[in-house]
Amino acid sequence: MIPVTTLKDRKVALFGLGGSGFATARALIAGGAEVTAWDDNPDSVAKASAEGIRTEDLHGIDWSQQALFVLSPGVPLTHPKPHWTVDLARAAGVDIVGDVELFVRERRAHAPDCPFIAITGTNGKSTTTALIAHILKSAGYDTQLGGNIGTAVLTLDPPKAGRYYVVECSSYQIDLAPTLNPSAGILLNLTPDHLDRHGTMQHYADVKERLVAGSDVAIVGIDDSHSALIADRVERAGVKVVRISRRNAVASGIYAEGIRLVQAVGGAMLPFADLDGIQTLRGSHNAQNAAAAVAACLAVGVSADAIRAGLASFPGLKHRMQPVGKRGRVVFVNDSKATNADAAAPALSSYDRIYWIAGGLPKAGGITTLAPYFPRIAKAYLIGEAAAEFAATLGEAVPYEISGTLERAVAHAAADAERDEAAASAVMLSPACASFDQYRNFEVRGDAFVSHVAALDGMTMLIGPATGEK
């Protein structure tokens, strides 16, 4: 835990007692703050009270006495309308921050020189974050991994000299971190997302820009127009910018040339790493993630050889284009995290012959945007509520069956793929749908896929059964 000592003996109001909010309350108390916490969920309040956290409806506190208001990132700050606690804090002139801001202040107070890499972007954040942490750990560095990737940042070990922090930041967390100042800040890309919480694309982009604008080194993907403009603007403001691209050469930075990463420096184009054969980094989207990781690790002093070794040994992330098993020429891929068509596209673009398991609770737009990848699909196996809709979209372009259940889809796809005479093929769960019609969440769906694959005869598992761990 990181005790928040910068608020010792100060009164702090806190709203939101979910996972990160609960951890934040404990970190504040450990640092000596006088915390008053609340949540709209009575069960969360009861749990906090049972753990010794002082709880009180924030309608009734004296806001003029509060040094700070700490808001959980899942609570609306501006859109669709500010949460009632936000209105109360603003009316009293109390600053509003989140857990990442508290971490930033503790680092600044106790170990301002310890390397801190922050990662954001619409897509690829978690893979890039995990890859950077893996490279650092593999190279022998004391590495702390947290943030939006699933480990609350204040549950990490406290800042000290020589300790490296790798923190994934959502737009909500950045919005609540006004003094965010990483050693290296990464903005991977920007496409419309979370506009219900940010109002406009411009506001969403402005929030993301703050992370790189406050960085010592800004690493920016320039393959979309919003991010390219941000790179130019931040550079004009005097920040060192390293540009990355998966599509085009850059004058200075890291870019992908097919499956190779190239470092552009001082007018020279130097081959840096070959991603061929690294199953967990297949696809052009992962080339961009790898380019960002390379740039960040170079920025904090990791040697080129250590970075290459880390790339080659990266185990990947659960449920994200994750090779889980192999039988003969057929690889089985868990991409359960692909909960919409855009998220499924990278996996479909990364294999040439696919037995595709898709469906679940459909999202608006269905799978029409995936038509360019239909020639790669040998057959589709449709499950869940989306089956009929997806069947209509596939029409005569792709052979399909309505399997109904994931277990049946895995069995049928595996049998068909085994009969395929192609040199290599993939049985892939990349549902392009939410899971809630059949599973509690995408993780449970992915674990079910792993279990069904593990039950097949003659299977060589690449991970532990139903755990997704190497």
Swiss-Prot record:
<dbReference type="InterPro" id="IPR013221">
    <property type="entry name" value="Mur_ligase_cen"/>
</dbReference>
<dbReference type="InterPro" id="IPR036615">
    <property type="entry name" value="Mur_ligase_C_dom_sf"/>
</dbReference>
<dbReference type="GO" id="GO:0008764">
    <property type="term" value="F:UDP-N-acetylmuramoylalanine-D-glutamate ligase activity"/>
</dbReference>
<comment type="function">
    <text>Cell wall formation. Catalyzes the addition of glutamate to the nucleotide precursor UDP-N-acetylmuramoyl-L-alanine (UMA).</text>
</comment>
<dbReference type="GO" id="GO:0009252">
    <property type="term" value="P:peptidoglycan biosynthetic process"/>
</dbReference>
<protein>
    <recommendedName>
        <fullName>UDP-N-acetylmuramoylalanine--D-glutamate ligase</fullName>
        <ecNumber>6.3.2.9</ecNumber>
    </recommendedName>
</protein>
<keyword id="KW-0131">Cell cycle</keyword>
<keyword id="KW-0436">Ligase</keyword>
<keyword id="KW-0547">Nucleotide-binding</keyword>
<dbReference type="InterPro" id="IPR005762">
    <property type="entry name" value="MurD"/>
</dbReference>
<dbReference type="InterPro" id="IPR018109">
    <property type="entry name" value="Folylpolyglutamate_synth_CS"/>
</dbReference>
<feature type="binding site">
    <location>
        <begin position="121"/>
        <end position="127"/>
    </location>
    <ligand>
        <name>ATP</name>
    </ligand>
</feature>
<dbReference type="GO" id="GO:0005524">
    <property type="term" value="F:ATP binding"/>
</dbReference>
<dbReference type="Pfam" id="PF08245">
    <property type="entry name" value="Mur_ligase_M"/>
</dbReference>
<keyword id="KW-0573">Peptidoglycan synthesis</keyword>
<keyword id="KW-0067">ATP-binding</keyword>
<dbReference type="InterPro" id="IPR036565">
    <property type="entry name" value="Mur-like_cat_sf"/>
</dbReference>
<keyword id="KW-0133">Cell shape</keyword>
<comment type="pathway">
    <text>Cell wall biogenesis; peptidoglycan biosynthesis.</text>
</comment>
<keyword id="KW-0961">Cell wall biogenesis/degradation</keyword>
<dbReference type="GO" id="GO:0071555">
    <property type="term" value="P:cell wall organization"/>
</dbReference>
<dbReference type="GO" id="GO:0004326">
    <property type="term" value="F:tetrahydrofolylpolyglutamate synthase activity"/>
</dbReference>
<keyword id="KW-0132">Cell division</keyword>
<keyword id="KW-0963">Cytoplasm</keyword>
<dbReference type="GO" id="GO:0051301">
    <property type="term" value="P:cell division"/>
</dbReference>
<dbReference type="GO" id="GO:0005737">
    <property type="term" value="C:cytoplasm"/>
</dbReference>
<comment type="similarity">
    <text>Belongs to the MurCDEF family.</text>
</comment>
<dbReference type="GO" id="GO:0008360">
    <property type="term" value="P:regulation of cell shape"/>
</dbReference>
